[in-house]
């Protein structure tokens, strides 16, 4: 009877160790995924930084504005030039 109780307690202890190790591995995997998402987000933001200015972005000439934008005649910002494209 004592040996059965000992085996049961040993089994529960072993199960607790395995579960905690699995939980630690899961947390590490989650951290890696979050880091990858943050790095991807940072890279995406850097990729969006372009040499041209977006709508209502400050500019000094038409060449500073992105496609289909032009410099406003009175203000130094980019506005839509009235053209369309596919």
From Swiss-Prot:
Example of a GO MF term: toxin activity
Keyword Disulfide bond tagged: yes
Tissue specificity remark: Expressed by the venom gland.
Predominant cellular place of this UniProt entry's protein: secreted
Prosegment location in residue numbers: 22-50
Cystine bridges: 52-66, 65-78
Pfam families (alphabetical): Toxin_12
Cellular localization per UniProt: Secreted
UniProt signal peptide: 1-21
Keyword set, alphabetical order: Disulfide bond, Ion channel impairing toxin, Knottin, Secreted, Signal, Toxin
Cellular component aspect of the GO annotation: extracellular region
InterPro entries, alphabetized: Huwentoxin-1 (IPR011696)
Family statement drawn from the similarity comment of this UniProt entry: Belongs to the neurotoxin 10 (Hwtx-1) family. 17 (Hntx-9) subfamily.
Role: Ion channel inhibitor.
Domain comment in the entry: The presence of a 'disulfide through disulfide knot' structurally defines this protein as a knottin.
Protein name: Omega-theraphotoxin-Hhn1e
